[in-house]
């Protein structure tokens, strides 16, 4: 048990950052043990307390050698500290920076991830964000562990969350995008996409605009590996990527698949992890915090610049191109293209949205810019986001009124609109809370869980101290 106070730790190096805060490599001062510490700003994250609480709950209730170990949490000032196991090998996404992985390495990693998923699914827990960036490695033991439970769900007490639009678009199961009730099989789909990601260096459709990906996944046939991969590997992927979630193999069943049964030991991947002179990756590759799915909207605010960032630090505004270095012979599938019709007959506002969805480039719309400039500097980003979401919703509604849309186009738009509304459902209340005086004192009047009450009480104490000092 590690001490639960900030003075007991020395922060050594930033490992990653995301929507909630920062992850540090840290040393416990007495024992000298190296751990990872996730710091979350409770002032900026107060509206997301449910997600923060969910991660703490999930981690504290896991006891598996293939899941990152949780050591405890405490509040210091306005910051929540979550103490976790540190993995010195970084992430699989970091490993992919040096090239695509061969099937031997992939089978080992997949087997270890399946052990973790089999454990979670046995407790009716869904991870909901399986991808290479959330699979961490140990360079000393070769151990492989699942991390980042910020969007995980407990099926037994979170039925409503099974309809929630969460995760990362490229790895999302069709039923998640379509907002139908989903379960453990959603993780299996993401695992299949991750298998392709490790084989090709990038996930399927990685060069497409994320909005376009959301359209395509439910409407298209599942991705497949090229024929030059082994039949057993291709069959494994197909067992994961069935459009019907009921037809996907379970984690327990996949552990018996020939591709997994033939995998070597975790020690076989250590040589890759210890080649520091080749700079396979460093601590900065351990990105255990990722932007949430709401950041899919970022391309509407900033231009997309392909190829200038790594997929591990994905924020839905850049994408990593395939590395030419190959650790095993593989090839990258060509992008599929969505055709469009009657563009010139559509109103300019509709053509703007269509261009955004159907292309890999996006620029800010004047409506968003003009409205955001009217707000104060404190609320500028929120106002801009509010304006853009309002604009997108009204534009989609206008597009649906166009009688020249084909049945397929109309179905795609309706599916997208439903998903978008889900993303936007809490925006209005958050906007009102941000501009209402003392909103945080009224934000959580409903009954709080023990963790939520602890954080809220600590916040009130610090607020009172601040008022006393200023008074």
Swiss-Prot record:
The active site is at 129 (proton acceptor). It comes from the Eukaryota. Residues 9-260 form the Protein kinase domain. This is Serine/threonine-protein kinase sid1. It is found in: Cytoplasm, Cytoskeleton, Microtubule organizing center, Spindle pole body. It catalyses: L-seryl-[protein] + ATP = O-phospho-L-seryl-[protein] + ADP + H(+); L-threonyl-[protein] + ATP = O-phospho-L-threonyl-[protein] + ADP + H(+). One of its GO terms (molecular function) is protein serine kinase activity. Interacts with cdc14. GO terms for cellular component: cytoplasm; cytosol; mitotic spindle pole body; new mitotic spindle pole body; nucleus. The gene is sid1. Keywords: ATP-binding, Cell cycle, Cell division, Cytoplasm, Cytoskeleton, Kinase, Mitosis, Nucleotide-binding, Serine/threonine-protein kinase, Transferase. ATP binds at residues 15-23, 38. Has a role in the septation initiation network (SIN) required for cytokinesis. PANTHER family: SERINE_THREONINE-PROTEIN KINASE SID1, STERILE20-LIKE KINASE, ISOFORM B-RELATED. Belongs to the protein kinase superfamily. STE Ser/Thr protein kinase family. STE20 subfamily.
């Amino acid at each position: 048990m590690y001490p639960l106070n900030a003075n007991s730790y020395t922060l050594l190096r930033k490992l990653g950052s995301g929507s909630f805060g920062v992850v540090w490599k840290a040393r416990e001062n007495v024992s000298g043990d190296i751990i990872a510490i996730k710091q979350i700003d409770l002032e900026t994250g107060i509206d997301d307390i449910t997600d923060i609480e969910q991660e703490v709950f999930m981690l504290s209730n896991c006891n598996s050698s293939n899941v990152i170990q949780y050591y405890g949490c405490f509040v210091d000032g306005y910051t929540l500290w979550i103490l976790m196991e540190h993995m010195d090998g970084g992430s699989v996404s970091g490993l992919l920076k040096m090239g695509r992985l061969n099937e031997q390495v992939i089978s080992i990693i997949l087997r270890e991830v399946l052990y973790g998923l089999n454990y979670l699914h046995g407790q009716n827990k869904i991870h909901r964000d399986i991808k290479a960036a959330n699979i961490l490695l140990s360079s000393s033991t070769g151990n492989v562990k699942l991390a980042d439970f910020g969007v995980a769900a407990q099926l037994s007490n979170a039925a409503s969350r099974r309809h929630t639009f969460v995760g990362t678009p490229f790895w999302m199961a069709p039923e998640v995008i379509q907002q139908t009730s989903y379960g453990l099989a959603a993780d299996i789909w993401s695992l299949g996409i991750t298998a392709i990601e490790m084989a090709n260096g990038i996930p399927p459709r990685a060069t497409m605009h994320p909005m376009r990906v959301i359209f395509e996944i439910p409407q298209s046939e599942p991705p497949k590996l090229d024929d030059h991969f082994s039949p057993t590997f291709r069959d494994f992927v197909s067992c994961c990527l069935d459009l019907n979630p009921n037809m996907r193999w379970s984690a327990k069943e996949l552990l018996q698949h020939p591709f997994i049964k033939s995998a070597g030991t975790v020690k076989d991947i250590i040589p890759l992890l210890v080649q520091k002179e080749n700079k396979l990756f460093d601590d900065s590759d351990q990105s255990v915090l990722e932007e949430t799915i709401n950041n899919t909207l970022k391309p509407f605010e900033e231009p997309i610049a392909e190829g200038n960032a790594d997929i591990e630090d994905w924020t839905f505004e850049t994408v990593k191109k395939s590395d030419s270095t190959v650790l095993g012979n593989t090839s990258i599938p060509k992008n599929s293209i969505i055709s469009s019709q009657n563009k010139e007959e559509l109103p300019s506002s509709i053509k703007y949205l269509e261009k955004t969805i159907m292309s890999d480039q996006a620029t800010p719309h004047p409506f968003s810019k003009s409205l955001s400039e009217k707000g104060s500097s404190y609320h500028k980003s929120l106002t801009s986001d509010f304006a853009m979401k309002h604009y997108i919703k009204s534009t989609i509604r206008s597009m649906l009124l166009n009688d020249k849309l084909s049945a397929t186009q109309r179905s795609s738009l309706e599916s997208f609109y439903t998903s978008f509304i889900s993303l936007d459902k809490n925006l209005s209340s958050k906007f009102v809370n941000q501009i209402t005086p003392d909103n945080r004192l009224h934000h959580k009047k409903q009954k709080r869980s023990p963790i939520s009450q602890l954080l809220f009480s600590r916040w009130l104490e610090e607020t009172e101290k601040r008022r006393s000092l200023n008074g």
